[in-house]
Each structure stands twice: as structure tokens, then as C-alpha cells.
Amino acid sequence: MNHIRNFSIIAHIDHGKSTLADRIIQRCGGLADREMEAQVLDSMDIEKERGITIKAQTAALQYKARDGKVYNLNLIDTPGHVDFSYEVSRSLSACEGALLVVDASQGVEAQTVANCYTALDLGVEVLPVLNKMDLPQADPDTAKAEIEDVIGIDASEAIAISAKTGMGIDDVLEQIVAKVPAPRGKPDAPLRAMIIDSWFDSYVGVVMLVRVVDGRLQKGERFKMMASGAAYEANNLGVFTPAQQSRDALEAGEVGYIIAGIKELKAAKVGDTITLEKKLPNNLGPATEALPGFKEIQPQVFAGLYPTEANQYDALRDALEKLQLNDASLHFEPEVSQALGFGFRCGFLGLLHMEIVQERLEREFDQDLITTAPSVVYEVVKGDGEVIMVENPSKMPDQGKIQEIREPIVTVHLYMPQDYVGPVMTLANQKRGVQMNMQYHGRQVMLTYELPLGEIVLDFFDKLKSVSRGYASMDYEFKEYRPSDVVKVDILLNGEKVDALSIIVHRSQSQYRGRAVAAKMREIISRQMFDVAIQAAIGANIIARETIKALRKNVLAKCYGGDITRKRKLLEKQKAGKKRMKQIGSVEVPQEAFLAILQVED
């Protein structure tokens, strides 16, 4: 065990994490040069294109150090984005060390800070590394000062590297061997292994990536999950180098995979502990307590996904089920909307997660989708004291039956150059934010706000990028539910509610939002043969109205002079026809109308 080193890499998007991983794998001969490709560990196309890592991946590498000994290095690649923060914390807790990669030309960013704090909380040894030193605008001194200021770890011995050219890679490996502690585990205790990640393979079922903490697991042994109690047989186990390589046993301190013919990803939850099923003569039996830190992931953001053609419903369900095989944090259930027909209510970890799911559905499964406005989960206390969770505006009970509504509040860390503090604070205040803290680190400022999650999910991130010209970065974590004066605004067309257009907003903005949506609808819905009234209402109170005037045919064109009664008869006849049409005619709500809600500007 003394020759094992488990480490991961923490970095902001685009600071060169995957490139560094490629270099380390190449240096340790993990893949032959012909198998090397850019971003080896990012296996999904969308990961490569967006330059982000979504699922954790690993590589077990052999490195011959300068002291002549051979070390087993386990590189555990972590996702870097705030939506996947639970997966990050699980990946990090499987390591003893982490490389903090900072782009020497840009300095520290908010997500790096968030993940770095997670690592320090878990007691992981953090080694700072300055990447992109081959760039002319690299400024190592400022970057070092920022690391010390913001994260508070000593950066005087930060290693200068360039992952692109391969400079300094050996120094990094030597530092890992020298500074990262060997795994702390008991080889002779009952088996305990933590699931770092799991994914679905169409041939063998679920593949679990695990870190063995105590004991050992042999091929063919039966093991059980401690959270669910389900038991399976380990048909196949081994390590990734990043290519799959079978072994007979996984020992304490190692990181490897287990294949046990599990059909559903839900059975292998990230963060769960694996132990042996029962005591046999040749083993130590099950462990008594699970490893700490496991929690069920709760979706934070909900949106409706509907197929554009009604006959595509089954195809969409298949696509979602297949996606769920590889993404246990995606929740969905069927729902029916009067306006959009059959579809699904989906729950996501955050906005990036939602975008990725949508993009994968469109790209990998050729689905044409309509997405309703994203909403968050509200806690509603009904008149009789019952508490329900409402994740869909159309499910909100009537105003009269509600005692109070609580909305989710998140703590947001905003990180930006000091020139943009003003505009960013204005934006946060518009979104009902409460400032909690403000710290200066050199030229960078870190603002801490408490904001309602409902204000963030719509367009906060885009606005933040535009007011700070792209320099600000943010990360957020859920804090609590808090009573709030929010109301549901319904949109009516000719007195009929259109459920998919309902929104939940704070009372102070309800008038304004209602008017804005009604005005937007007026632009989008085409003119009919009769007047169309668009109304926004809170309960029975109408707060805004727009009217789309009818198209009109001139029935008097054929009359010439003559008696007024003749003209009046024709006009009355037209009026009666319009009235009859208005009673039976329905208004087609075009696709754009549902997206328009998202674009209603503040």
C-alpha cells in the first residue's frame, strides 16, 4: 500500500485539466502513442466539444520515480462544474491528494475555489500547479499570490508546467510521489469500498468505479450495497489504464471497477458503500458501518420536455430511459399538458445539467423538443397544515387554500475583477439577493449573496456574464427553504388557462411579469378571425390584458349608396358570424410562445 498514490485534478473549465491528464498518462505509458488522442478521459462527444468533464474517469498508471521505485498512481478525473458538485466530492474523498491546476494567465476562478474548499474539507493534500506557462501573457507571481490569498494554501513551491508542450510533467509526478500520502486503509479489516461513479455498458450492465478503503474483494465473491441492501456477485473486476484490464482481486487503497450484472444505475448509487454479503470461512464478513458522506441527490431545477410531434412520445421516453442509464441524477415522470399534449416533467441538478440533457437528447437520439420554463421546487403549507412539494406551477393549489409558500434559497459565491463589482451587485439586488460578505483578494473580489434559486434558474448566469463582460464566475449551494411572498401567475387566452404558460414569481414582480408576458404573447400569436383576449391573472384577479384585433373583411364593399338598413343588415350578419366563431374557435399557441416566457426581459 505504501506505493499507491490516489490523486485527482481540480481545475476551472479550460484551465487545461484534461490536457494535463493526457500528458501524465502518456508519460507513464498508460496508452501506446497511437492510441493517444486529445482528451482521452472525456469519452462523450459533448464533453470534448464543451471542453468539460461530466462523468468521473480513472487511470491506473505505473510510474518509475527518481528514487528507482515503481509507484502505482491512480488518477481520478473529476467533473469541474458546480452542477456536479456531489460527484466531485465523492471523487475527491476517494483521493489523498489533488493537483490544483491554475491557468497562469488567468488566475483563480470561482469553481476552482469551490472544489478546492471541498478538497480541503475532506482533508486532501492540495498541490498547486501553474499551467500554460508557455503563453506570453503568463504571470506566475500574480497567480501564486491569488492562490495564497483566496484559497489560503502555500503556493511558494507551485510547479510551473505547460501541459500542451509537456514541460514540467516529471516534476508534477515527483511531487505526487513525495507529497501525497499513501492510502489510509486497513488491509485486514472487513471489506469497505466506496462507489465513486457508475455508468451503463450495453453488454455487461452497470460498471461501478470503486475505491477500496478496507479489506479486499475477490472475483466471484458476493457483496451488498449498504444503502439499499441489494446483493450481487462480482463477475469481473479490474483497473483502468485508461483501457480496461481484468484482475483477480482489488486490494485496500486501490481504485478499480466492478461488474456484477446490475441492470439499473439506480442500484449503484454514487457514494454508497460496498461490503461483503455474509460471513464465510474464507472472509471477514460484512462491515458494520458505512463510509461517511453518502446522500441521495435531489434535483433542484425542473422543466417539462415535450415532443414536437405527438407520435414521438414513446421515442422520447425510450431516449430518457437510455439517458437515465448513464445519469442517475436525471429524474423524469410523465405529465400531460392541455397545450402541449403528452410529455415528461424532468428534474435536473442545475442549469448546465439541463442543457446537457437537452443537447444529448437532440444529438444522440434525434429528438425535437419543446422545453417549458425551468422552475424550482417550492414547499407549500396548505390550510390544514399539510406540507407538499410543488415542482410544477400548474400543480400549485389555489391561493385560498395556502397558508404559506417557502422557496429554496441558495448561497452564491460570485468572483470577479473589481471593475465589475458595481454592475454585479446591481444585478444580484434586482434578483432579490441579500449580500452576506465581500472580500478583496488583490484585483479580484469575492461576493457572497443569498439568492432565491428561482431567480437564478431563468437567466442569472447569462446576465452575470454580460454585465461582467464574461469575467465573473459563480458557484452556488443550497441553503434552506424560507417563507416568501410568491404567487402563481396564469395566462388566459379567451378565458381559457394555458397551463404550460403559468409561472411562479414574487408578488413584487408579478404585475410587471404578467404585463410583459401578455405583451410578448400578443406579438407571437397570429391574428384570428375574431378578437383574442390575452390575460394574466393571479387567482381571480386579472392583472394585465392585451387584445389581438380580429382580421376584418369589408362586407360593405359591394354596396353603393342606397339605404343604411341594407348595410346594417350585412354588418349585423358579420357580427353574428364572428360571435359564433369566437365561441367554437380555438387559438393555436405557437411553439415560440413557450420559449418566449424564458426571454421576458427584466
UniProtKB/Swiss-Prot annotation:
Signal peptide: none annotated. InterPro entries: EF-4 (IPR006297), EFG_III/V (IPR035647), EFG_V-like (IPR000640), EFTu-like_2 (IPR004161), G_TR_CS (IPR031157), LepA_C_sf (IPR038363), LepA_CTD (IPR013842), LepA_IV (IPR035654). It is found in: Cell inner membrane. The gene is lepA. GTP binds at residues 14-19, 131-134. Its EC number is 3.6.5.n1. SMART domains: EFG_C (SM00838). This is Elongation factor 4. GO terms for cellular component: plasma membrane. One of its GO terms (molecular function) is translation elongation factor activity. Residues 2-184 form the tr-type G domain. The lineage of its organism: Bacteria, Pseudomonadati, Pseudomonadota, Betaproteobacteria, Burkholderiales. It holds the Pfam family GTP_EFTU.
